[in-house]
């Protein structure tokens, strides 16, 4: 599945993305380390290759979806947005994302989340999409709130951000009915009024 928006394209990650992702992550290590549980020190090519192999396998089995966040015009990969394993029985999933520091603050992540929601709700027909972010991750919380996710509560010390360091997590969610009621407004607000184009593999 590929999803095309106004400025962004979401496309499945593949093994050839490894070198680019290593470069982006390591250039953003100081910012990512504070909020990403998998980010300790600089990542190696071997570690990224292993992640991409798992990501491709999960996508092939429809267990989870891992997308490169790509600038539509330049074709540059600038981050990753993905689901955690999908609970197909309950038609629900949680999502996560990161963007390289050099591209943050420009609305790219917000657009990417809206595009992913379109794919999850309208194509995969999921019932519920959730996202958790550390309470002190101001930028991520702002993105989720702008889009219109419903705040569900705080999970006490549920996010591990270092071997012996934990943070509280804000939990947000959207139901399919909630998304459909705000869908047109989201496109007007974040996609220049254009509907996303979803291409199924």
Positions of predicted regions on the chain:
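Conserved GNAT-fold acetyl-CoA-binding loop/helix
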Residues: 33-53
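A short helix-loop-beta-strand connector motif used in the catalytic cores of GNAT acetyltransferases and
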Residues: 53-68
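Acyl-donor (CoA/ACP) binding surface of acyl/acetyltransferases
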Residues: 1-20, 24-31, 66, 70-201
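Residue-level detector of secondary-structure transition/capping positions
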Residues: 26-29, 40, 56
